[in-house]
Amino acid sequence: TSQRPGTLSIRTETLKSLLMDVVEALYRQGLRNFVVLSGHAGGTHNAVLIDAGECLLSRLPEAKIAVVTEYDLAAEEGKGLIETVGDSHAGEIEASRILATRPHLVKEGAVEAYPAFPKHILVRNKQAYWPSAVWGDPSKASAEKGRKIEEVVVDALERLVVELEEFVEPAGC
């Protein structure tokens, strides 16, 4: 979606450096448990966050780190709510969540779409393959579903925080 109006992109190196700098600063101040919660479900973006987390684990001996996207939590925890298989950007999940909080931002009439990019080939003009910016079925969205999704995401995040706090890594390697 980097070619869409309103999108601000940063280089992966910048994202990694920013995350590492923030976590290291907080670690120096005494924090030890870190949940990196991303609102973006892009594969490259998440790979960078995981890579930064792995680097931080090797540099900060007492740190515990979890990396998760709120979208993954919504998809995993909302299995009984979500009707669309393969739902993603501006689809059922995202449209429902926005309908629950900022309904005026949801464009009416968005149609179901599942873009097909060339397999294994990187493309410059992503809009040629993904003209609508929709990946999923926004017609199945509702404000009520969005509120329920928000609840399950918060519950899952609370469980993750507790799990991370209680996590004891096995010794040795």
Which functions belong to the PLM regions below?
Residues 1-35, 39-173:
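Extended, histidine- and acidic-residue-enriched regions that form the cofactor-binding/catalytic faces
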